[in-house]
Amino acid sequence: MVTIRLARGGAKKRPFYNIVVADSRNARDGRFIERVGFFNPLARGQEETLRLDLDRVEHWVATGAATSDRVAKLIKDARKATA
C-alpha cells in the first residue's frame, strides 16, 4: 500500500522531515517514490516551516495513497495557509 508520510532527516536533536510518497513496506527513512514537500518543526524567524506540493498530494490521494495522521494535519494546515 502506498502512503504519504514523514521521513526523518536532520541532525541529532534537530529534526527535519521530508514528506514522501512511499510503499508502506519500506523503512521510514528508506526508499520512496516521490518527495512532495518538507516540514521543519524547529524553524526560526523567516525560515519556512512547511512546504507542500498540493497538486502532487491530490494526485497521489486520488490514486489511492493513504496519509499518515500527522501528514493529514499538515495538508490541512497547508490548504488553510494558501486559501
From Swiss-Prot:
Domain of life, source organism: Bacteria
Annotated InterPro entries: Ribosomal_bS16, Ribosomal_bS16_CS, Ribosomal_bS16_dom_sf
Xref: Gene3D superfamilies: 3.30.1320.10
Annotated GO biological process: translation
GO CC annotations on file: cytoplasm; small ribosomal subunit
Keyword Nucleotide-binding tagged: no
Pfam families referenced in this protein's UniProt entry, alphabetically: Ribosomal_S16 (PF00886)
GO molecular function: structural constituent of ribosome
UniProt keyword list: Ribonucleoprotein, Ribosomal protein
Family to which this protein belongs: Belongs to the bacterial ribosomal protein bS16 family.
Stated name of the protein: Small ribosomal subunit protein bS16
Source organism (scientific name): Shewanella denitrificans (strain OS217 / ATCC BAA-1090 / DSM 15013)
